Amino acid sequence: MDLDQWISKVKDGQHLSEDELQLLCEYVKEILIEESNVQPVNSPVTVCGDIHGQFHDLMKLFQTGGHVPDTNYIFMGDFVDRGYNSLEVFTILLLLKARYPANITLLRGNHESRQLTQVYGFYDECQRKYGNANAWRYCTDVFDYLTLSAIIDGTVLCVHGGLSPDVRTIDQIRLIERNCEIPHEGPFCDLMWSDPEDIETWAVSPRGAGWLFGSRVTTEFNHINKLDLVCRAHQLVQEGLKYMFQDKGLVTVWSAPNYCYRCGNVASILSFNDNMEREVKFFTETEENNQMRGPRTGVPYFL
């Protein structure tokens, strides 16, 4: 496995062969299986939100924030679906994980799921680019190994979606059996699917999975777990980044500019230096993004 050569190849817009991709996926699974459900990460590190198959914009993200391994990254899931280059996005992230395992942390998002990828594009894309479903199978097997959250210097929790009524302490996240398809309910599901809302406690989510959670829930969770902040992604933010609640105890980071090639939003990444001081970097879409057409099919999001 010549990882450096493969990285150059994928950055140049080529695909790995089916056999190379299989080898890479098996290799990365061996790294991921060692990671905790709450993977400890040291600052300095840069936190990123959804990418959704926008490969050229991911390349711009690295130009904006610095390249691995000079910059350490946490990607909070939703690498695939919706954009037209999910395969390239997931492949390059796997290659960087294989080459620099200590410098990049990949969290699972609700789209890292066999079920959703068959509806929202990744399955069809793999079929189109490889002529069969093997590549999709290799990648979706890796999904089951991805960790659920990361904690920066013990004080900032990163998770794709949000909180769960079944998770009061971070230790409860450590106990989840993660090596499976995302369940339809329960704590694992909630971490992937929940959203913050301007309420006090809990409410039913319009997404049909996870919960809406409010200010008091978030403040209590942070207090009990000695956290300064919960970082999450999962929701489009027109301005790229949004703090929630009076105490700003939660932030949404969104890293797919001009989402779906038509939303007109900016993207952001959130950097923490060695003193845990924060810096937001914003970026807009690439020329390639602008040349893409709008979505081919109007599949409604609420399942």
From Swiss-Prot:
Task: Please indicate if the UniProt record lists Hydrolase as a keyword.
Answer: yes
Q: Where does Zn(2+) 1 bind?
A: 50, 52, 78
Residues crossing the lipid bilayer are none
Q: Name one GO cellular component term.
A: cytoplasm
Q: Which residues participate directly in catalysis?
A: 111 (proton donor)
- Origin superkingdom: Eukaryota
Family that this chain belongs to: Belongs to the PPP phosphatase family. PP-6 (PP-V) subfamily.
Would you tell me the protein name for this molecule?
Phytochrome-associated serine/threonine-protein phosphatase 3
Source organism per UniProt: Arabidopsis thaliana (Mouse-ear cress)
**Phylogenetic lineage:** Eukaryota, Viridiplantae, Streptophyta, Embryophyta, Tracheophyta
The gene it comes from is FYPP3
